[in-house]
Amino acid sequence: MKKLIAIVAGEPNSINSEIIAKSWKQIKNKNNLFIIGNYLLIKKQINQIGLKIKISKINSINEIINKNNLNVLNIPLKFKSTFNINKIDTKNYVIKCINMAHIMACKKIIKGFVNAPVNKNIFNGKFLGVTEYLANKNNVKEKEVMMLYNRK
């Protein structure tokens, strides 16, 4: 199997699902991509905004069969409203998604991951963002790097 790249769904109370869905439609080579997030939430959010994309729920990357579907590695999340999830559940969900991607990257199950935007308040002021959170988890002090690209 090709080395996979994960996309961490990020903040559930946002337009991340829309960005992921619209980007998915534009991507030609989908062979090595999958999402880490809550399957039902992403499916309902995409349906709610009126986009038509085939989505598959997977519980392991070994279950990725249809490369044209948006494969979502399911992370549990209880919710009643698709864009109004309480702060504690949001925090726990986002941290679980990031930690899952981190574990998979450390075990070399995935080549790397990209995280969709998150509300920095989930880190309770301990970290500026995901980059610093991951640097801390890996005992990297003041050497964290963030890649940015701008055509201008």
Task: Give the positions of each predicted feature.
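Anion-binding alpha/beta catalytic cores of soluble intermediary-metabolism enzymes, centered on
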Residues: 1-152
